[in-house]
């Protein structure tokens, strides 16, 4: 007997011996043991920056892994395993490492956590513990810094020793008077130095550098000694920019980091800063007119050369540097937990990206893995041949470059298992359709893979025209008939053992389509019903499914277009509501039971607006015209009638219809000329097609093109000016936007002359963003009118000239002081000031007067100032101290500044009013009036006299309060009979002003009585405030 025959006989004996056991009612399967798995990190240590001066007495590095059985933990410092004994400074709490009383000398370094259980060991990513510090500034006095007013200056910070980097601010004279970040001042966050582009008198003073360290646990700031900035006589000359704060020629950055380039220049006028990317374009989200260029999250696309340009009317200066972008390792492909059969081969692979390119190595149970025997290590590949049980364990792929290290972990479980059907037995009942085909899988759990054999009853099945056993053990029976019913058993065997599983095949009637859907043509927006009816085996449930071009139709989508018929189980009609172009195609109706199915197709054609044209190409580019061509898109079953062309430019980004030649573009055209474009402008174009059913989606945008240059066609606007230093004519205008520049090399051409003069002077000002020009000449008198015109130019020529505007040269301060200044206190907190006005002079337009006042005994430098908003010759000054003598001067002012001071005048404010309100209020009531009486208020020696009393009265019928004055300590006021309540306030008045009020609240009680509530309140807010309440009752004319 041959080997195949012996094997078949052996399996037959196994079949006969086990069939009774399989069918025995006492047969059962025991449950598997609880799953075990190796450590998987849930929390890994992260780097810490610990302040050397911290009050904290410990540092915790976290580590936690999920594992079964639970993991145990070890730690390494700088690659050496740590001795974590009880009572030492290093304690293990769970998986966390706690370092007590950390110091830089003993504890700074690289830490790793190791988690282990019987399955294997994994190591965590590395965590670096660093120690931060910030020392104090030197106690030595700083030398004064001297320069000329109008020059630029740099004040060095010279920060103390520190780690890591700092942030910087500067103080002027006192805290918290911080130097603002504006176009004239700049604080370098690289060096801490303070730069002033052009100094002026307001910069005089003492400066201190404030350095701040931001650590993980705390923030610390230190101040430098003050350094005095002294300014020599002003140098009125203009200077071209000179860049003083420069970014380095090369700046390295990691992907995702923020990159900051610094650039600041000295110059007069103050230079404007502009940034550009030499070999690309800047993101619109980045600030491009600031001393710093910040890239919030740098990417490889941001690598390149960047240029900073500082420009003013006297010239320009530039600096360039390159940003080089690198990256930490990042996984492209990682390993995953794997179960493999004993004796099989396995190939694991991992791949990482990074710059520089990462190196890859492997660990097994936390130890380096090298090629040996059956294991081959090839960079990112790990290969096993003929796996055995000892290969099980925890594996890690490690990718590293100079910027970091990453770990990918996986468990390898090598299995040796006898065939086992407990998790995946053969189906007990296997229904099949007559005339159809059935596949019965046999997939026992086994390692190595089991040999499969099938039987029907006691007959071993082999391959035939109707029966096939596939390589994976699946039994396939075709053209099924009633004779195929019965028990089918799958036998599985490997060197570990044998097993089998049985199922019963039951043959049912086939499913058929009795009414198939019909093809149809519809328009967009129409409704359509596709019919589909079927017959089936009555013992089974029937379901209908629909597909469109082999994709399932979604009936449950909210707001969808499909509805399903639900009249009868054998009817599966599909209705399309408000059909769209995307609903056209081949629909398939499938009627299915659990054993078989039948299907029929129908084609739905949906007519609609045309699809987008394609291939939009721009050629024959002129200054205001281009020629467009395109290819026809789908007409969607309705002829194209016409085309519409649109364009957009970068400034607006909005698509607008353009003029064309021909004006109306017919449906058979594939080219047209675009008219009326702007010269030297970037454009994108798109094309839309229309038919009788509407206009379709536009084409994709064309490639961006730039029209040719032309002479500017529009004059600049907003011509004005004035101001500046003596001897200067400052001319301002509105910079022309990109769409009106018409070409490169753009700038402005100014013409100006003294009013009445015959000859014009000209000045050429480069730069589209320039918005002012300063002409300096010592011969220019203050506030001299000039006639000014402006035009723009580019490299193609000069544009049209604007209308003439009158601009005045810089004003000078008034030369004459006001005379006959008089001042007198009008209350305890106010005084009146008057003066004889000065005449308008030729130095400028007088805007008003500045009143300076200070207390006797103080210096004039401490004076407060108020300005009039017009040319009034008197004013009231408020907010003064009571019973205080003040000195007062008055000066005229214009836009250039204030003139000389008048001789000082003196004024004495009044004593304050009495702080006591009127008390002991009594009353007499009649039907139409209320008489109130109170004790006279006697002022103290430090209070002003009382000349009378003010009474403020308001009732619910009269929302506007009425003021009554009396020089006596009583008053009678009318009280309408129909009021509900009224409010009365009584206070003293006199030379020192009004005193604190006593408030009386009157509420009518019935027809003949009212209640009076009295309280003394401070006049802090307008609403009624009640305290120290006194309640009186008014009843007829009697006093209680």
UniProtKB/Swiss-Prot annotation:
Listed transmembrane segments: none
Swiss-Prot/TrEMBL keywords: Cell adhesion, Cell membrane, Disulfide bond, Glycoprotein, GPI-anchor, Immunoglobulin domain, Lipoprotein, Membrane, Repeat, Signal
| Cystine crosslinks | 63-113, 157-209, 263-308, 350-397
Q: Which residues are glycosylated?
A: 78, 200, 206, 463, 479, 500, 527, 777, 832, 920, 942
Propeptide residues? Answer: 1015-1040
Annotated motif Cell attachment site, positions: 796-798
Q: Name one GO cellular component term.
A: neuronal cell body
Lipid anchor positions (GPI-anchor amidated serine): 1014
What are the protein's GO molecular function terms? carbohydrate binding; cell adhesion mediator activity
Q: Which CDD domains match?
A: FN3, Ig2_Contactin-2-like, Ig4_Contactin-2-like, Ig5_Contactin
**Which InterPro entries does the record associate with it?**
Contactin-1_2_Ig1 (IPR047102), FN3_dom (IPR003961), FN3_sf (IPR036116), Ig-like_dom (IPR007110), Ig-like_dom_sf (IPR036179), Ig-like_fold (IPR013783), Ig_I-set (IPR013098), Ig_sub (IPR003599)
Q: How does it sit in the membrane?
A: Lipid-anchor; GPI-anchor
Query: Residue ranges of region Disordered?
Result: 897-922
List residues of the Ig-like C2-type domain. Answer: 39-130, 135-224, 241-324, 329-413, 419-506, 511-605
What PROSITE patterns does this protein map onto? FN3, IG_LIKE
Q: Which GO terms describe its biological process?
A: adult walking behavior; axon guidance; axonal fasciculation; central nervous system myelination; central nervous system neuron differentiation; cerebral cortex GABAergic interneuron migration; clustering of voltage-gated potassium channels; establishment of localization in cell
Domain (Fibronectin type-III) ranges: 612-710, 715-812, 817-913, 917-1008
- Pfam families for the chain: fn3, I-set, Ig_3
The answer to keyword Aminoacyl-tRNA synthetase applying to this record is no
Family under the similarity heading: Belongs to the immunoglobulin superfamily. Contactin family.
> What is the role of the protein in this entry?
In conjunction with another transmembrane protein, CNTNAP2, contributes to the organization of axonal domains at nodes of Ranvier by maintaining voltage-gated potassium channels at the juxtaparanodal region.
- Mind telling me which PANTHER family this protein's record contains? CONTACTIN-2 (PTHR44170:SF28), PROTEIN SIDEKICK (PTHR44170)
What is the designated name of this protein?
Contactin-2
Please name the source species. Answer: Mus musculus (Mouse)
Higher taxonomy: Eukaryota, Metazoa, Chordata, Craniata, Vertebrata
Question: What is this protein's gene name?
Answer: Cntn2
């Amino acid at each position: 007997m041959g080997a195949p025959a012996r094997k078949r006989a052996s399996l037959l004996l196994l079949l006969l011996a086990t069939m009774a056991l399989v069918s025995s009612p006492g047969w059962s399967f025991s449950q598997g043991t609880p799953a075990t798995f190796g450590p998987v990190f849930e929390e890994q240590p992260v780097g810490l920056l610990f302040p050397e001066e911290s009050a904290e007495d410990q540092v915790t590095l976290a580590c936690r892994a999920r594992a079964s059985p639970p993991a145990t933990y070890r730690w390494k410092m700088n690659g050496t395993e740590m001795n974590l004994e009880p009572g030492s400074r290093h304690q293990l709490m769970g998986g966390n490492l706690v370092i007590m009383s950390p110091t830089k000398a003993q504890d700074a370094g690289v830490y790793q956590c190791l988690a282990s259980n019987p399955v294997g060991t994994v190591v965590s990513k590395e965590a670096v513990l660093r120690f931060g510090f910030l020392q104090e500034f030197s106690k030595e006095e700083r030398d004064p810094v001297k320069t000329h007013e109008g020059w630029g200056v740099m004040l060095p910070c010279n920060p103390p020793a520190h780690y890591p980097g700092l942030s910087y601010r500067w103080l002027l004279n006192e805290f918290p008077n911080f130097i603002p970040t504006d176009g004239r001042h700049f604080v370098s966050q690289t060096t801490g130095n303070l730069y002033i582009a052009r100094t002026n008198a307001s910069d005089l003073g003492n400066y201190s550098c404030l350095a701040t360290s931001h650590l993980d646990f705390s923030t610390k700031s230190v101040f430098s000694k003050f350094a005095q900035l002294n300014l020599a006589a002003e140098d009125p000359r203009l200077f071209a920019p000179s860049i003083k704060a420069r970014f380095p020629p090369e700046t390295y950055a990691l992907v995702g980091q923020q990159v900051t380039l610094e650039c600041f220049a000295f110059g007069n006028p103050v230079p404007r800063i502009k940034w550009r990317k030499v070999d690309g374009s800047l993101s619109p989200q980045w600030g491009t007119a600031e001393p710093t260029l910040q890239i919030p999250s740098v990417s490889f696309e941001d690598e390149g050369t960047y240029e900073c340009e500082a420009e003013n009317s006297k010239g320009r200066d530039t600096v360039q540097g390159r940003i080089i972008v690198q990256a930490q390792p990042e996984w492209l492909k990682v390993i995953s937990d794997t179960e493999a059969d004993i004796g099989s081969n396995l190939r694991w692979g991992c791949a990482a990206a990074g710059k520089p390119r990462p190196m890859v190595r492997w660990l097994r149970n936390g130890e380096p893995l090298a090629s040996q025997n059956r294991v081959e290590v090839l960079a990112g590949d790990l290969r096993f041949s003929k796996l055995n049980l000892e290969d099980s364990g925890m594996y890690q792929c490690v990718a590293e470059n100079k910027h970091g290290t990453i770990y990918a972990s996986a468990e390898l479980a090598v299995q040796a298992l006898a065939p086992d059907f407990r998790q995946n037995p053969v189906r007990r009942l296997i229904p099949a359709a007559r005339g159809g085909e059935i596949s019965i899988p046999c997939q026992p759990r086994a390692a190595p893979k089991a040999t499969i054999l099938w039987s029907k009853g006691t007959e071993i099945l082999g391959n035939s025209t109707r029966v096939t056993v596939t390589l994976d053990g699946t039994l396939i029976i075709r053209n099924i008939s009633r004779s195929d019913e019965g028990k089918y058993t799958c036998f599985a065997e490997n060197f570990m053992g044998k097993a089998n599983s049985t199922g019963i095949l039951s043959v049912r009637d086939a499913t058929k389509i009795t009414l198939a859907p019909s093809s149809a043509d519809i328009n967009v927006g129409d409704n359509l019903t596709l019919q589909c009816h079927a017959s089936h085996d009555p013992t089974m449930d029937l379901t209908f499914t629909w597909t469109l071009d082999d994709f399932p139709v979604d009936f449950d989508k909210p707001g969808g277009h499909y509805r399903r018929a639900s009249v009868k189980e054998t009817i599966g009609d599909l209705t399309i509501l408000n059909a769209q172009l995307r609903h056209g195609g081949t629909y398939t109706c499938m009627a299915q039971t659990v054993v078989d199915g039948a299907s029929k197709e129908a084609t739905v054609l949906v007519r609609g607006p045309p699809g987008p044209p394609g291939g939009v190409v721009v050629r024959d580019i002129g200054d205001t015209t281009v020629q467009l061509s395109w290819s026809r898109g789908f007409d969607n079953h309705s002829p194209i009638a016409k085309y519409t062309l649109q364009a957009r430019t970068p400034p607006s980004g909005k698509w607008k219809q353009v003029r064309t030649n021909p004006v109306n573009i017919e449906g058979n055209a594939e080219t047209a000329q675009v008219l009326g474009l702007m010269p030297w402008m970037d454009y994108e174009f798109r094309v839309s097609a229309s038919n009788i059913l509407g206009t379709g989606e536009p084409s994709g945008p064309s490639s961006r093109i730039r029209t040719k240059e032309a002479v500017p066609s529009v004059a600049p606007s907003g011509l004005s000016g004035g101001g500046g230093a003596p001897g200067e004519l400052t001319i301002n205008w509105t910079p022309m936007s990109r769409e009106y520049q018409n070409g490169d090399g753009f700038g402005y051409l100014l013409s100006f002359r003294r009013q009445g003069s015959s000859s014009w002077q000209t000045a050429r000002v480069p730069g589209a963003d320039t918005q002012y020009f300063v002409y300096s000449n010592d011969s220019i008198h203050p506030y001299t009118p000039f006639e000014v015109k402006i035009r723009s130019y580019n490299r193609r020529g000069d544009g049209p000239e604007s209308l003439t505007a009158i601009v005045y040269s810089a004003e000078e301060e008034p030369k004459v002081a006001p005379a006959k200044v008089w001042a007198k206190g009008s209350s305890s907190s106010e005084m009146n000031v008057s003066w004889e006005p000065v005449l308008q002079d030729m130095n400028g337009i007088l805007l008003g007067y500045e009143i300076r006042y200070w207390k006797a005994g103080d210096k004039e430098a401490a004076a407060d100032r108020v300005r009039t908003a017009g040319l009034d010759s008197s004013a009231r000054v408020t907010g003064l101290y009571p019973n205080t003598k003040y000195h007062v001067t008055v000066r005229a002012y214009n836009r250039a500044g204030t003139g000389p001071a008048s001789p000082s005048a003196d004024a004495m404010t009044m004593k304050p009013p009495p702080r006591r309100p009127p008390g002991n209020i009594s009353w007499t009531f009649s039907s139409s009036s209320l008489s109130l009486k109170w004790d006279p208020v006697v002022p103290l020696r430090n209070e002003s006299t009382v000349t009378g009393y003010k009474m403020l009265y308001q009732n619910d019928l009269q929302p506007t309060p009425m003021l009554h004055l009396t020089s006596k300590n009583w008053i009678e006021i009318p009280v309408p009979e129909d009021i509900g309540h009224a409010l009365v306030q009584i206070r003293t008045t006199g030379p020192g002003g009004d005193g604190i009020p006593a408030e009386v609240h009157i509420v009518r009680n019935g027809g003949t009585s009212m209640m009076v509530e009295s309280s003394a309140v401070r006049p802090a807010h307008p609403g009624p405030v009640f305290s120290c309440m006194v309640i009186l009752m008014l009843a007829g004319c009697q006093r209680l």
